[in-house]
Amino acid sequence: MLKQANQQVLINHNRLLTRSFSRRFFLKGLIFSAWAPYSLSTPIKLELDKVKLYSAATDHKGDHWLVIANAKGESLNQLRLPSRAHQVFKHPSLPLVCVVARRPGKYLSLVHMNTGTLIKTISPSKGYHFYGHGLFTQDGRYLVTSENHIKSGEGRITIRDRLSEFSIVYQYASQGVGPHEIKLTNNGQTLVVANGGIKTHPDKGREKLNLNTMRPSLVYLELLTGKLLEKVSLPEQLHQLSIRHIDINQHNHVVIAMQYQGDKTDQVALMATHKRGEYIRLLNAPINSYLAMKHYCGSVCFDFSGMYAAATSPKGDRVTIWDTVKGNIVDELRCRDACGIAAFGKQGFVVSSGAGKLYHYNIEHKELKRLLPQTFLTAPPLVESKVNVPSPSKRMAWDNHLSISI
């Protein structure tokens, strides 16, 4: 425990050191390494009429939906889901989106993005459940998911082949417990896994069963074999800092957003970065900035430049912006129940909230602006062919994650 250890973690010249200092882990004493600067990418020109947003959502009755919307946040298609979902992501070339059930998940829904029609529902193998995240490989052939082997409590990566009706063709250990978000490096051959370290069991719902012994990790695996290429963890004193959500930029640098499972009075960093062959680097921020995040980050992503990252903290009603080259926070904004976030425009992000609102953030101007003229996301007008669409006058709350296709 941090309070018992009375230690402080310092990051200095890419080396992790521990030294006795105070009752808790104090952020103001951290020394942070910065990456060498690199030039910004060529800005992406957006054709707004082609932009689509994807997210799970919940209506006023507690029913759960897949929502596909345009750049203004106007709903284009919706599909009722059997239970609450977590992540939605698009196939790289086909008009197909995948919806992953929230942990402990029991379904994947494959949906036609242009019609909102359910194409296929996939259940986990016996003795497994989904952990809320997945991805399609760059060539679009394979569907990859993070899963839990219930009996052992160990994480698994499962790969299904689209060309054989999404049957399982590869399955291997995630090299940790509680794998959550997964990403591919730019070559498409290496899978990066955020092993949150938290053991769960479906019979216990969402109860966390191993908080005293949890050991999160960030691992790099060979995609089609599961061969361990690299595994990194934070120091033992931070073993309750769950590595949950990640993103990768064009330089294969990883940004990490974490959730702390320890004492509520502990003062800990929640944001970090990693580069192959190095240690995990915590990002610098004033103590009050991290405290305002309430030990919880909900989602994270890089902007298109790969230099800046944004993280949401729904428990703290915060959106924070980070310069990953300098290794520090550059902006923070209040945003009620902000959670979903995705890169959008030149050095910008779209943020979704549990209040049903959408915002655009511009790094240059440091402004967070509403995208919707109305307060809540609403459904399109009812038509006979869309019997599953709820009343357009009822509020819909965006769920944890947001995806964008251009």
Describe every region a protein language model picked out.
Residues 157-162, 211-223, 269-276:
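Beta-propeller blade signature
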Residues 146-149, 193-214, 257-268:
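Short, conserved, GDST-rich strand-edge loop motifs in beta-rich repeat architectures
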Residues 74-79, 119-124, 167-172, 227-235, ...:
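A short beta-strand motif characteristic of beta-propeller blades
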Residues 2-45:
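N-terminal export signals
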Residues 81-110, 116-136:
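Blade-loop segments of beta-propeller domains
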Residues 83-89, 129-135, 177-183, 240-245, ...:
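Repeated scaffold domains used in trafficking and secretory/extracellular systems
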Residues 92-93, 138-139, 186-187, 249-250, ...:
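Residue-level detector of Asp-centered blade-edge/turn motifs that repeat once per structural unit
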Residues 127-133, 146-185:
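Asp-box/WD-like beta-propeller blade repeats and closely related beta-sheet repeat scaffolds
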